[in-house]
Amino acid sequence: MQTKETRGLVLYNRPFREDDKLVKIFTETSGKHMFFVRHATNSKLSSVIQPLILANFILKINNHGLSYIEDYKGVSLFKEINADIYKLAYATYLVSLADAAISDAVYDAPLFAFLIKTLELMDEGLDYEILTNIFEIQILDRFGVQLNFHDCVFCHRVGLAFDFSHRYSGLLCPEHYEKDLYRSHLDPNVPYLLNQFQTLHFDSLKTISVKPDMKQKLRKFIDEVYEDYIGLRLKSKKFIDDLDHWGQVMK
């Protein structure tokens, strides 16, 4: 086992035996690992093994089995996220998506930084739905999916009223719509925004303003992408869908 001090984000915990817990932590320097916490209820670690806790951990890391938490310091809480059921649901989906995107024990500091920055912006009050869309689009490559939202796959022209073709995994301009009779028939603003999302750097993001009807169109198309290209069905995503449904019913 290696002893390391590293920043880490708690993804989730689950009961193990009577009073023990298994805790999944995404670390900045060693990827994701499962940690065993004995007698978790009365442990000094009890407050720091909750989901969405960010801290500097001292860890004993085992690449071929359970790892152990030695100590911690510098705990950060996403207070605004935890105080809002919608933000919490979307944040939980993000960490589930990051967990699914890479294997355990795989170093991926860029994904770690991207996840933390997304959660920080969400906690600061930026639109959690659009932040989630941006995250979903930018981590597609972690699932081995490369989609072109920039130019027509046939003539490579840009700035037109594009539609998306699942057949060609990219955009069709009006002159090439006929290449795919089953094209998506998208609002042209959807591929335009997805192209922006694909290359956006959060350091330059100060505000987000997207109309509700466009959010629905983005959500529908991104769901289709994840279904058709990845086949991913996360419980946390279903919870969001159910929550949004009941939110509409209650209006």
Swiss-Prot record:
Cellular component annotations (GO), alphabetically ordered: bacterial nucleoid
Keywords recorded for this protein, A-Z: DNA damage, DNA recombination, DNA repair
Highest taxon of the lineage: Bacteria
BP-aspect Gene Ontology terms: DNA recombination; double-strand break repair
Matches recorded under InterPro entries: ARFGAP/RecO (IPR037278), DNA_rep/recomb_RecO_N (IPR022572), NA-bd_OB-fold (IPR012340), RecO (IPR003717), RecO_C (IPR042242)
Keyword DNA damage: yes
One Pfam family hit: RecO_N
Family under the similarity heading: Belongs to the RecO family.
Function: Involved in DNA repair and RecF pathway recombination.
HAMAP family: RecO
Name of the molecule in the record: DNA repair protein RecO
Organism placement in taxonomy: Bacteria, Bacillati, Bacillota, Bacilli, Lactobacillales
Gene that this polypeptide is encoded by: recO
